Amino acid sequence: MEIYLTGNLTDTTEEQFEYPAGFVSELNSHIIMVLDTNSCSEWDRTIAHELSHAIDRRLAFRSQYVEHALFSEEAWNSFNPDSFSYLNSYHDSGQYWSKDWESVFFLNSYSITYATEDRAEIFGNAVANYHSGWSEDLRFTGDNPLNQKYEYYCNCIRDGFDTTGWSSVMPWEMLKESEIEN
């Protein structure tokens, strides 16, 4: 992965977020992460959020070719409210947002834009919690769907990568581990 630090990023299409702090894409068959150094105030969360998009590319690709790959969009969607569909747009998420979903199904209204953003928000927050020294986050406890998404994504990451040399608990899994210990 190549990482590019840049100045202000702005949307040049109707489909994108107006002022992104970063994005992940491909350039000459390499995954690149581009970060806006002017708008990024929470580097740990933003970098982890964008890294999650690269992880998603790996998991989605692998799920097409590995018969028993854990990751699937169908499994992910099973943790969402009945009849829920992601907006598949960065615009107007606020008008579709239900406060009843907050901390139960989704972290925030940005999480309902795309499934990839939902996962990125969860992963980014888990890493930010680790960097802040938090080993407990009540949003990621118990049997609620948000915690089930978090645990599922952690398991998918372990399933989708060669974990040789990894710690038994990685930084993004610390909230999961604290739940196991309690």
Model-inferred region functions:
Residues 1-5:
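Short, well-ordered secondary-structure micro-motifs within conserved domains or adaptor modules
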Residues 6-182:
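Active-site-flanking segments in enzyme catalytic domains
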